[in-house]
């Protein structure tokens, strides 16, 4: 937190600036995305591997099956593939047949919140869409939510940006961000401006 001294008094800061999980390209995109918030502490990370330009890729959400087909052609049984969504009920129905359709793929599904502390070789983030079940989640509206949860930060979608940062940085090799073409998340435009490529096919 940038306000540590306000709550806990004086202290020293020791920067852990090397990551052994994700490659430099994933780190570059994730850091530039989250540090657009001026209140976010600047903490550039160095990686031991460079990563390719397409290590983070935007892809239409109707390409999930095609992506899993392609992954089954080169991912090894030891490669973990993590499929993440903002909400648990957004788990795709296609995963029910995954064991028979993609028997070689080591697939796990969980929410982004549950993925904290996890890592995988490949990560697929679902649900970059606008609306009630979107990512970023809509502003909380109920009086109960406003009373129980911390006050929102001044920078738009600050907490949701941190959540997408968590999702992206679970991956060692590649991340695909699947978006709804009809109702894309506003994060899609932000990511495009950070030179994240949009692929027509996996």
Please tell me what each predicted stretch does.
Residues 1-4, 91-102, 186-195:
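Short, aromatic/basic amphipathic alpha-helical patches
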Residues 1-53, 199:
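Conserved RecA-like helicase ATPase core segment
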Residues 6-8, 49-51, 101-102, 115-118, ...:
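Conserved catalytic network of the ASCE P-loop NTPase/AAA+ motor domain
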Residues 13-15, 56-58, 109:
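Conserved beta-strand scaffold positions in the cores of enzyme catalytic domains, especially
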Residues 18-22, 85-91, 183:
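Acidic, metal-coordinating catalytic cores used for nucleic-acid/nucleotide bond scission
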Residues 55-66, 200:
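Short acidic-hydrophobic, aromatic-tinged amphipathic segments that line or gate anion-handling sites
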Residues 62-129:
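Conserved helicase/translocase motor-coupling segment
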Residues 77, 105-106, 115-181, 186-190, ...:
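Conserved helicase C-terminal RecA-like lobe
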